[in-house]
Amino acid sequence: HDVTLFEKSSRLGGKLPLAAMIKGVEVEDVRPVISYLTTQVGKLNIKVRLGEEATVSKILAEKPDAVVIATGGLYRLPSLKGVENRNVAGVNSLSKQVKLPLLVFGPELLNKLTKLFLPIGKRVAIIGGQIEGLQGAVFLRKRGREVTVLEPSETFGKGIPPRYLDRLKPWLAKKDVQLLGGVTCDQITDQGVVITTKDKQRKLIEADTVMVLLSQEPDTSLLEALKGSVKEVL
């Protein structure tokens, strides 16, 4: 196949460098994946258009027989009072903050540097208890933060392979990371997160920093826009 790859940022890899920085190398080293895929793109003579967002007009100008959409999902902030407060951070804002440091230091060195300095409060409440939230909890606990994870469902760790999750949950318990399931987050304040527990009790989870690490939602906008214009859209 003759392949053209659009990437709106200035480098390949998407959020993999961020994932590599958060995960570290102890359990799952993501860095070789980034290196391997980037190398293969070069070896296979794939036309890479960095710094270009894949718009409908640009795609159709290529006159493609098929389009594979791999733009990733959307990380949205919930409709929650106080979510725009200064003590709140989400995946998108965190990605912007670490973009330059990742370019300068790389994932491994930045992972080590965050153990020396991390501009996040001592007490952290994480909204979202699936793969993003639990990996964030591990990262922060290893850096001395007191972590509480708030999850609306009763299930934690969706997206994490079972063999890892079976080891992760005991580790979190041993490190005093609080996992609160079946809760409703009512409001974010300067003092933390006001929640309603599954037994209908209203309480404040005290936190200096609130991190919204909810799972991403599908982004089907480009898929819908291309329907009928290209023979195959995947």
Model regions and ranges:
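C-terminal catalytic ATP-binding subdomain
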Residues: 41, 66, 92-94
